[in-house]
Amino acid sequence: MKKVLAIAVMALCAGSLSAQQNVNFQTACHPRDVMHYDTKTLRERFVMEKVMSPDEINLTYSQYDRFIFGGAMPVNKDLELENFPALGLSVDKTIAEPYFLYNRELGIINCGLGTGPVLVDGKEHVLAPKEALY
């Protein structure tokens, strides 16, 4: 099964400037264990607290189907989706590939109020609010 990455974006621009990149990990929980979790434990196991923050890319790697989800919010600079070595070193060596989309698909949704340019393989796509690019 192909891995899918969905990034909710205010206006993601692929550029050469380095962005703060944060990666969190969610381990799988057994359904019988989850039945006994209190609210605090449920939030610790399943909520991604930090999705959108200025000039950062925030991702969470979930062991449920090796799904990666997150957000990017360029405010003062372009953001570039780079490979995250932490993904290959800490969780799953099969995803330590030469570049982030080597063996993955990407879905981008513009959650902002304005248009957002996205640069893919040298071609610019301008997304209107609520538009998606796959």
Where in this protein do the model-derived segments appear?
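A short, N-terminal "cap"/entry segment at the start of jelly-roll beta-barrel domains
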Residues: 20-76
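A generic local secondary-structure boundary/capping motif
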Residues: 57-58, 97-98, 131
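Bacterial Sec-dependent N-terminal signal peptides
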Residues: 1-21
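A generic structural signal for short, solvent-exposed coil/turn residues
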Residues: 8-11, 51, 59-61, 101, ...
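Glycine- and acidic-residue-biased ligand/ion/polar-headgroup-sensing regions
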Residues: 64-87, 91-122
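Short acidic-glycine-tyrosine-enriched beta hairpin
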Residues: 120-134
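Short beta-strand-initiation
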Residues: 54-55, 64, 102-104, 128-130
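Generic recognition of cysteine residues
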Residues: 13, 29, 111-113
